[in-house]
């Protein structure tokens, strides 16, 4: 067994060695390359097939040798780098192919010119054979077209780095290709032989017919020529994508000899957002790196492998400005000194210079966005292979920085003494592990020492024991440090905060803007400046329009100039360095202090290109070149809006004054619905072939590779609309031929109209001055119609009505006439406004649209308020009738421009209709009288006939009765007996005989002697019984007949019945009136008194007396009613209990329209009554009002009170007995203030009646403010639905509090990974007792106003989100001035205004009146609505829950900014906050309303210094502000090349498009016109001041559909995507992600914990701490700094000693372990793997986030984060969000 296993093991290992050997892999790759067929195969096959004879064999040999030689060159190019560069570049094909193709073309066309005749001595002199060899050699180097070999080439390149013996790999791959090629050619030969031998195939050829013999012979003779033409076409197809290297125009680069003006451009070309780690900004992917480190005015540049040392000397001369010479005022010299010691020249190969297709004259693509102006040069791939040390071992890294490797190679070449001794791998690893062990031990010792110091030195503070962060110091004596923003030793938040700046804003620091008011007062008087540049800067600083309003406005004002260049900042510094010597205006100018900046430049292309789209938009008019360099998608600019009003900016320039008369236009780009083949490529650049994409639609949104077809949801390769096909089949089956014909006619008619309309439009365009004539005619027609024709018609109509003794309708007609609007439109139909004409309307054309056209009516109908159903029906009927039209040249109206005229409404048509109706009525009146008379006569005759017949029948019946009585025998005992007429059935006779026999038998037995007598008696009795039965039956039958006759329905009987019913109904109504007469009379008296006293109410003397009289009479009446009701209720209670509320609810459910109106109630009366009643809890009123159980009187009955008490709505017994304090507030706000029951309907549904009643009563016992019990708190089940009350402290508490907070965050970090149990509450049990601490300290720590409004606070860090205000609202600093008592030291707290978000707002969110893009300008203070929830309704629930409980979802995982809508009341804000109005000038000041408040502000200012000492964070926050200020200044410098916006509206449009149009939404054809109509209406509504009327009318007409406005709540985007209505096209932007963004998107979980909850006297929140998980446990590692802490954890977790030190490529070594030993250790490997997975899952969320985020830039060296995210997904498990 052991022997067998040994043999098997050897065989397996042998097989593995053979498979992994270099020779086998090379053979495999070589065999695969045979399938990549190129154009050289055509030559080879032609030589093998077409050529025959001795020359043919020679051609075959030369073809095969050339083919093999070409392929050998390709394989050698894999090993030899210069040859690979030469053959791999596209310009190689350009240089080699074009001349050779021309030669080949002339060779085949003019054979006699090159033919020297064949010589048998030396066939190599024959040029034909040489050309065959060259054809196969050269064309083998060209691109392949049947199976492209790019994938194979990549595999070969990867394996070349893995294997050691590279030459063996190349030779083996060539041998493999040779084998495959021989097999392929043999297969081709066999196929040809089979075709020759098969007669059936040869017989089908056209040669057998005599007609085509000549053609076929010609075809064979000219085969070479046809072949050369085809080859030329294929090669031109390839060469068409390649730019010509000689004749293309080179782009103009930016000149580098611009002195100091060009210097800032070179030095600051990097992304504007600096990250926390400045080294992350460095792009290590480039060879030509340019490093620039300015220290003390010196600069080092590494550019194009040349080292220069440039020294800039900046001199400022001591000048005298007596003569006013401008040239000597600002002198600057630039001196370039070249040092020969630092000058090094590195050669460049000729191949890279000639054949670098990207460096030849232009790049492939030009990627430009807001962050990067010039495109980055990308000379190499983002993957670069090189050896590096990782974990103590030397490994091949595929993302090694290429600049380091090239630098190392250059140094090795130039410095001969530089040698690198390679140490063995085991020794390197041992050294590395030893080093890490030492580090771990040092950290352990330091950690233990610090812990011991905690126990020993208890008097020391925690701050001294904690590890301090190290700072980078460049001057130890003065202790000067680097700024925190640039300090490499600082990590995380201490590196400074980044202001999120908008891309179009030109930001100036607020300190500079405010300080500008006093700069010129001092220096402007003392200093005389003659330079033009100084004048501009002074003009900028003299502007005093800067205020907080404009600083925090939604759109920044246009700023033509900005303080961003280095020179201007130096001039600004110059103002502070001026020293005045004497009156002769001599100035001594100090030398400038150089600006030290550590930065790094990325190599970029030296030119800037503009696209065709930018030229169309007209941007950057100053710097735009003559021709755009980038080919953009075909588009047209459509002018939407022109603004004549000037916008006053912060900074102005001379250009604004010059162009003040010009109009400010807003244009949108309209794209054509065609595929974009241009793809923003640079003109003349390489057109790369897109092999991976497959396009099957005419216009496909998302082009992708066939590899991803499995991810498509469709079943088939092409989309198959099954439901659409089914509908079509059903429709075709159901419809008849007539309908089809009718539809065809309609379609033809509409097509005719459309063609006619197009023809008319084309005719107007064809003539030269037609648009001028048409435009002038349209304007005259509109003026004539509006101001002459229609007023004349109104005058004629009303004068004729007055003559005909009818009331004239002047007001109605004039109202309709004023409503008509003539809107000017562009030639395409885009609406502008009534007064605004489109640009160049005389040349481009104009359309005039008539909105609400006036039609003259003979009379106006009275508008009765119709129901909603009637209104909807009316809208449906009017759906086809359009309430607008376009004006024609002849004064007619059309539905579409250049369409057919509409039929006018006739003025006389309704008159004729009315006349016809009246004539008909007049005719029908006499005929109605005759018809009624005839009906009455027929009824009378019918009644008389019926009566006559009834009398006759009664008489006949009586006669028949008399005859029957005479025939009968009278028996005295039994009455009348009939003998003759007996009708007995057989059955009755048989039964009677049986009974008689039985009776007779019994009698015989009992009474034997008298049996005969008894029998006779019995017989007689039986006979009499039978007769009686028969008689009763007959009588009953006759009665039935009589009743049937009498009950027949007659006309008079119906009348009688209906009259009875009417009488009964009248009786009931009278009873009801009698019953309710008292209330009716009372209501009448009230109405009469109100109407009587309304006229006299304005007289002041009478009003008071009247009011008292009215109130006294009303109280008397109410008391009387109340007594009567009480007596009635007592009687009812004695009999039975009637549930009043249930009956009332039943009444309401029966009649749903039943409602009451409380608007008629007087507010004064309500407050008067409330002051009389001693009740405080009126929250029941709200509940009653919400359920429409509205009662006119506010005296609620006892039945309602009992019912509410049973249901738990309120507790009547626990009402407050104190007097009610009625504040004079608005009525609606007073009612809304009682919001205890404003819970969502889900909460109401879950609550059980009785339990909820008990709990809510207990809760209100605590919440009642007047009760004495303060510390009572009981936990109930509706805590989740109650409004949580939280606050945020504005300043840091003491150090212990900070430590506790830090422990909570750290413990959360630990427990969120490991704990998979129930959710925990991280609240801390910190109670604030009012006895121990003063009120002043409490007020100083916490914000009073926040505590007051604590139910509405949103405990969320709003600094993360951006607020976008539409109008410039005065948002000042909110000042807390609520507490006005003198003995309390209140501190003025400045904090940001935060939206009030409650559960009621989230549950009952109602969108305000139709507002889109700010068209409802009457409401200035609301926010922009975010339509993300209407598209993605599934996120709405999560967002609403997050706003009330933000600890559920981390804030960084929310994908949107939810902008809440809010209307700010100006009166309230004036009372509570101080702000600076826009027209106020001067320094920043706060104003208060009361003197006490001013005193408090003064106290707050005095306490600021003391607060800095007490509060450690105040100084830190100031430092952060300084960092932000410096950061803003640096950003100001770096934004000088940014896009200058011409106008305010252009910036607004840009912001709107970037914020809301990040995705291009495309729609289907049937959805297209509807949306376009909506957009046209929007464009009109944007320009109107009060667009409410037009918006409503357009909604009614159907022009503006609400479903497109996304007002529906369940309007989901996924449904539209599935239906195919909307298709999203993402705008792909090349954005360079910031390091801070990467870290804080992964690390920063900004949770607001429950420890920020309100803790007051009445609320002591209990801390719910799980027993198993001690979340507030002390973490000793916090003693160390975060950096050392992370390092310590990683070193502990990595088991360095047990790690195997073998290399990855060890399987190629000879000293490989035996397979059996590996198999035995499988279990241990599995355990290690499990521990490694645990280790990774432990390290990922805690310690390695920053390292992995940096790894995206360093280790993986990618500009996009896709590779990084994929690695993260595969390596690390997902974690639940807690």
UniProtKB/Swiss-Prot annotation:
An example Gene Ontology biological process: protein transport
Main localization (coarse): plastid
GO cellular component, one term: chloroplast inner membrane
Membrane-crossing segments per the record: 18-38, 67-87, 90-110, 132-152, 175-195, 226-246
Short name of one Pfam family: Ycf1
Record localization: Plastid, Chloroplast inner membrane
Matching InterPro entries: TIC214 (IPR008896)
Signal peptide boundaries: none
Record key words, sorted: Chloroplast, Membrane, Plastid, Plastid inner membrane, Protein transport, Transmembrane, Transmembrane helix, Transport
Membrane topology, record value: Multi-pass membrane protein
Region feature Disordered, mapped onto this chain: 1498-1520
Additional record remark: There is a partial copy of the N-terminus (positions 1-341) of ycf1 in the inverted repeat (BAF50071).
Subunit structure: Part of the Tic complex.
Protein family membership: Belongs to the TIC214 family.
Functional note: Involved in protein precursor import into chloroplasts. May be part of an intermediate translocation complex acting as a protein-conducting channel at the inner envelope.
Name this protein carries in UniProt: Protein TIC 214
Taxonomic lineage of the native organism: Eukaryota, Viridiplantae, Streptophyta, Embryophyta, Tracheophyta
Gene label: TIC214
């Amino acid at each position: 067994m052991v022997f067998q296993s040994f043999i098997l093991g050897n065989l397996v290992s042998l097989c593995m060695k053979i498979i992994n050997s270099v020779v086998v892999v090379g053979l495999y790759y070589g065999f695969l390359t045979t399938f990549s067929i190129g154009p050289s195969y055509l030559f080879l096959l032609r030589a093998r097939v077409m050529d025959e004879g001795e020359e043919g064999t020679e051609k075959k040999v030369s073809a095969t040798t050339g083919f093999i030689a070409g392929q050998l060159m390709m394989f050698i190019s894999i090993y030899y780098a210069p040859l690979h560069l030469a053959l791999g570049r596209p310009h190689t094909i350009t240089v080699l192919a074009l001349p050779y193709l021309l030669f080949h073309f002339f060779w085949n066309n003019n054979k006699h010119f090159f033919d020297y005749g064949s010589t048998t001595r030396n066939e190599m002199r024959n040029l034909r054979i040489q050309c065959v060899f060259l054809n196969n050699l050269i064309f083998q180097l060209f691109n392949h077209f049947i199976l492209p070999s790019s994938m194979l080439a990549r595999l070969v390149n990867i394996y070349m780095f893995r294997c050691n013996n590279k030459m063996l790999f190349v030779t083996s791959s060539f041998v493999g290709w040779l084998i495959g090629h021989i097999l392929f050619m043999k297969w081709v030969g066999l196929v040809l032989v089979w075709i020759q031998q098969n007669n059936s195939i040869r017989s089908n050829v056209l040669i057998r017919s005599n007609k085509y013999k000549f053609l076929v012979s010609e075809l064979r003779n000219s085969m070479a020529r046809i072949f050369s033409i085809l080859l030329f076409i294929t090669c031109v197809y390839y060469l068409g994508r390649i730019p010509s290297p000689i004749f293309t125009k080179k782009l103009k680069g930016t000149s580098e000899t611009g002195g100091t003006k060009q210097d800032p451009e070179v030095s600051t070309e990097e992304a504007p957002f600096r990250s926390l780690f400045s080294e992350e900004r460095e792009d290590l992917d480039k060879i030509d790196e340019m490093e620039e480190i300015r220290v003390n005015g010196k600069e080092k540049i590494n550019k194009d492998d040349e080292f220069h040392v440039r020294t800039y000397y900046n001199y400022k001369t001591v000048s005298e400005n007596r003569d006013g010479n401008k040239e000597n005022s600002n002198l600057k010299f630039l001196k370039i000194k070249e040092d020969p010691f630092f000058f090094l020249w590195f050669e460049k190969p000729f191949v890279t210079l000639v054949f670098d297709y990207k460096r030849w004259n232009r790049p492939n693509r030009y990627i430009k966005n807001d962050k990067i102006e010039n495109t980055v040069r990308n000379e190499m791939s983002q993957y670069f292979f090189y050896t590096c040390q990782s974990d103590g071992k030397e490994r091949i890294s595929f993302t090694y920085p290429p600049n380091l490797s090239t630098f190392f190679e250059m140094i090795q070449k130039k410095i001969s003494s530089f040698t690198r001794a390679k140490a063995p791998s085991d020794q390197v690893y041992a050294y590395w592990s030893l080093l890490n062990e030492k580090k771990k031990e040092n950290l352990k010792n330091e950690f233990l020492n610090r812990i011991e110091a905690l126990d020993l030195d208890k008097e020391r503070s925690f701050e001294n024991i904690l590890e301090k962060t190290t700072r980078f110091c460049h001057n130890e004596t003065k202790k000067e440090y680097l700024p925190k923003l640039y300090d490499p030793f600082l990590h995380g938040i201490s590196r400074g905060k980044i202001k999120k700046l908008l891309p179009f804003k030109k930001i100036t620091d607020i300190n500079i803007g405010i300080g500008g008011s006093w700069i010129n007062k001092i220096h402007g008087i003392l200093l005389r400046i003659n330079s033009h540049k100084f004048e501009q800067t002074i003009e900028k600083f003299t502007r005093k329009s800067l205020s907080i309003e404009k600083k925090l406005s939604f759109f920044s004002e246009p700023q033509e100039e900005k303080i961003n260049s280095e020179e201007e900042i130096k001039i600004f510094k110059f103002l502070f360095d001026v020293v005045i010597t004497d009156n002769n205006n001599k100035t001594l100018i100090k030398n400038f202090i150089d600006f030290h900046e550590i930065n790094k430049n990325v190599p970029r292309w030296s030119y800037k290109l503009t696209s065709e789209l930018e030229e169309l938009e007209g941007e950057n008019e100053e710097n735009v070149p003559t021709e755009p360099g980038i080919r953009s998608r075909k588009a047209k600019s459509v002018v939407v809006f022109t603004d004549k009003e000037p916008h006053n900016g912060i900074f102005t320039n001379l250009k604004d004054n010059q162009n003040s008369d010009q109009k400010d236009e807003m244009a949108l780009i309209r794209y054509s619905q065609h595929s974009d083949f241009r793809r923003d490529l640079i003109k003349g650049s390489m057109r790369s072939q897109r092999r991976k994409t497959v396009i099957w639609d005419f216009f496909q949104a998302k082009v992708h590779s066939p590899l991803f077809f499995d991810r498509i949801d469709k079943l088939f390769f092409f989309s198959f609309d099954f439901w659409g096909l089914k509908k079509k089949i059903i429709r075709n089956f159901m419809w008849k031929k007539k309908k089809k014909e009718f539809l065809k006619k309609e379609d033809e008619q509409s097509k005719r109209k459309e063609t006619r309309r197009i023809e008319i439009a084309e005719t107007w365009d064809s003539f030269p001055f037609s648009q001028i004539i048409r435009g002038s005619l349209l304007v005259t027609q509109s003026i004539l119609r509006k101001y002459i024709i229609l007023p004349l018609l109104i005058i004629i109509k009303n004068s004729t009505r007055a003559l005909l003794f009818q009331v004239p309708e002047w007001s109605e007609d004039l109202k309709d006439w004023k409503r008509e609007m003539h809107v000017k439109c562009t030639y395409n139909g885009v609406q502008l406004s009534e007064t605004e004409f489109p640009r160049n309307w005389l040349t481009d054309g104009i359309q005039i649209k008539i909105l609400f056209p006036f039609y003259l009516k003979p009379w106006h109908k009275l508008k009765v308020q119709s129901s909603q159903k009637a209104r909807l029906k009316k809208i449906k009927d009017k759906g086809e009738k359009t309430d607008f039209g376009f004006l024609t040249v002849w004064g007619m109206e059309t539905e579409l421009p250049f369409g057919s005229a509409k039929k006018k409404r006739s003025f006389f048509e309704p008159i004729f209709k009315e006349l016809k109706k009246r004539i008909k009525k007049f005719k029908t009146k006499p005929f109605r009288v005759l018809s009624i008379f005839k009906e009455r006569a027929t009824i009378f005759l019918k009644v008389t006939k019926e009566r006559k017949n009834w009398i006759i029948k009664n008489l006949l019946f009586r006669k028949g009765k008399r005859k029957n009585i005479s025939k009968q025998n009278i028996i005295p005992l039994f009455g009348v007996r009939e003998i003759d007429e007996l009708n007995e059935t057989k059955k009755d006779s048989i039964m009677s005989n049986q009974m008689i026999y039985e009776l007779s038998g019994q009698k015989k037995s009992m009474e034997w002697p008298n049996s005969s007598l008894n029998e006779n008696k019995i017989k007689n009795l039986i006979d009499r019984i039978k007769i009686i039965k028969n008689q009763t039956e007959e009588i009953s039958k006759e009665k039935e007949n009589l009743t049937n006759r009498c009950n027949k329905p007659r006309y008079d009987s119906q009348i009688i019945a209906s009259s009875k019913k009417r009488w009964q109904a009248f009786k009931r109504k009278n009873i009801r009136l009698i019953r309710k007469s008292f209330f009716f009379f009372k209501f009448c008296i009230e109405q009469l008194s109100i109407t009587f006293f309304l006229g006299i109410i304005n007289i002041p003397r009478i009003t008071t007396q009247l009011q008292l009289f009215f109130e006294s009479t009303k109280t008397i009446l109410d008391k009387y009613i109340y007594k009567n009701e009480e007596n009635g209720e007592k009687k009812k209670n004695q009999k039975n209990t009637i549930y009043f509320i249930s009956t009332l609810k039943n009444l309401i459910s029966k009649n749903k329209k039943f409602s009451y109106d409380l608007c008629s109630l007087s507010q004064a009366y309500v407050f008067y009554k409330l002051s009389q009643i001693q009740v405080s809890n009126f929250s029941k009123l709200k509940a009653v009002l919400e359920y429409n159980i509205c009662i006119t009187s506010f005296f609620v009955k006892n039945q309602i009170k009992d019912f509410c008490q049973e249901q738990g709505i309120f507790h009547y017994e626990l009402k407050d007995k104190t007097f009610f304090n009625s504040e004079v507030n608005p009525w609606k706000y007073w009612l809304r203030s009682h919001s205890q029951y404003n819970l969502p309907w889900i909460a109401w549904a879950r609550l059980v009646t009785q339990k909820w009643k008990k709990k809510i009563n207990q809760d209100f016992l605590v919440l009642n403010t007047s009760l004495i019990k303060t510390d009572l708190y009981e936990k109930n089940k509706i805590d989740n639905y109650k409004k949580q009350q939280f606050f945020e402290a504005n300043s840091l508490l003491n150090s212990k509090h900070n430590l506790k907070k830090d422990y909570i965050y750290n413990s959360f970090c630990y427990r969120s990974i490991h704990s998979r149990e129930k959710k925990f509450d991280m609240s801390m049990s910190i109670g604030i007792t009012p006895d121990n601490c003063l009120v002043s300290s409490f007020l100083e720590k916490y914000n009073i106003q926040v505590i007051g409004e604590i139910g509405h606070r949103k405990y969320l860090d709003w600094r993360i989100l951006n607020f976008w205000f539409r109008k410039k609202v005065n948002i000042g600093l909110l000042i807390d001035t609520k507490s006005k008592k003198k003995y309390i030291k209140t501190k003025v707290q400045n904090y940001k205004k935060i939206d009030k978000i409650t559960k009621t707002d989230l549950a009952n969110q109602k969108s305000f009146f139709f507002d889109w893009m700010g068209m409802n300008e009457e409401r200035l203070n609301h926010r922009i609505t975010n339509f993300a929830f209407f598209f993605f309704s599934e996120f709405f629930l999560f967002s609403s829950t997050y706003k009330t409980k933000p600890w559920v979802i981390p804030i960084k995982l929310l994908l949107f900014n939810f902008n809440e809508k809010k209307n700010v009341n100006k009166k309230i804000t004036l009372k509570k906050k101080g702000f600076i109005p826009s027209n106020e000038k001067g320094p920043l000041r706060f104003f208060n309303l009361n003197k006490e408040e001013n005193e408090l502000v003064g106290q707050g200012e005095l306490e600021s210094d003391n607060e800095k000492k007490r509060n450690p964070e105040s100084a830190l926050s100031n430092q952060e502000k300084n960092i932000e200020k410096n950061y803003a200044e640096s950003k100001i410098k770096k934004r000088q090349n940014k896009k200058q916006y011409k106008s305010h509206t252009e910036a607004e449009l840009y912001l709107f498009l970037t914020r809301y149009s990040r995705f291009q939404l495309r729609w289907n054809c049937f959805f297209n016109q509807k949306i376009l109509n909506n957009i046209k209406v929007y464009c009109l509504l944007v320009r109107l001041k009060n667009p409410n009327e037009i918006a409503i009318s357009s909604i009614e007409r159907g022009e503006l559909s609400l479903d497109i406005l996304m007002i529906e709540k369940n309007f989901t985007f996924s449904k539209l995507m599935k239906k195919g209505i909307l298709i999203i096209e993402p705008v792909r932007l090349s954005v360079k992600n910031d390091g801070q963004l990467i870290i804080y998107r992964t690390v920063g979980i900004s949770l607001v914990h429950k420890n920020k909850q309100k803790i007051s006297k009445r609320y002591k929140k209990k801390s719910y701490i799980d027993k198993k998980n001690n979340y507030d446990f002390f973490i000793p590692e916090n003693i160390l700094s975060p950096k050392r802490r992370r390092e310590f954890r990683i070193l502990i977790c990595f088991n360095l000693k047990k790690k195997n030190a073998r290399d990855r490529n060890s399987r190629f070594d000879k000293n490989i372990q035996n397979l059996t030993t590996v198999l035995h250790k499988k279990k241990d490997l599995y355990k290690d793997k499990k521990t490694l997975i645990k280790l990774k899952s432990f390290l990922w969320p805690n310690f390695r986030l920053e390292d992995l985020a940096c790894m995206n830039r360093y280790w993986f060296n990618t500009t996009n984060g896709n590779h990084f995210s994929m690695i993260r997904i595969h390596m690390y498990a997902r974690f639940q969000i807690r």
